[in-house]
Amino acid sequence: MPQAPDQITRNLWHVVAATSELPIGIVQTTLLLDTPLALTRGNDGEPVVWLRSDEEQGDEIDADTILERLPVRTAYGYTWTCLGTPTDDLFPIPEFAEPDRVNMSCGSIGIHVSAPRAVENFLDMGHFPYVHTDILGSEPHTEVKEYDVEVSEERDEVLATRCRFMQPRAAKSATTAMEVEYVYRVPHPYCAVLYKSC
């Protein structure tokens, strides 16, 4: 039986859906920290999230009839909720508001993995040559070079910089291999942000 999340984790904001993919008046279901949730958008377009009882994926529902709701935020194109009492605001992604930036959801894929393990794998460049062969890495270029890590109490995040890796096809437009530099931000135990130069 899964262990219940600690109160600190329950009080964090967690992503539950790409807001643009959440239909109006149709139930979507998900699990958050082993807690069954249901969600939809009301006629006003605002997301509504609640503890799932007998609702099924695809059921029609009037969001106005949902009285016991979980807290909801929309930010960065996603719907966020909290199972406890949210104590903090969401972490900033200042680039999201840049007027010349195109922001999009690239879809989501359900995988059977814990949130900490998903973040750990996302941060691990060592898998590039073996999992993303001939795109993000290839043998014999398997070295993960030394990089810098900063734990910032002021920003409440971990920042890894100078993360360099030789990539055969770092971008769709790439015609030759190049060394790419990554910056990883971990501003939340279950969220990571990637900046890539190519």
Predicted regions span which residues?
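Detector for the c-type heme attachment site
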Residues: 56
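N-terminal pre-ligand scaffold of iron-sulfur
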Residues: 1-53, 61-86, 167
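C-terminal catalytic domain of Rieske-type non-heme iron oxygenases
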Residues: 43, 87-198
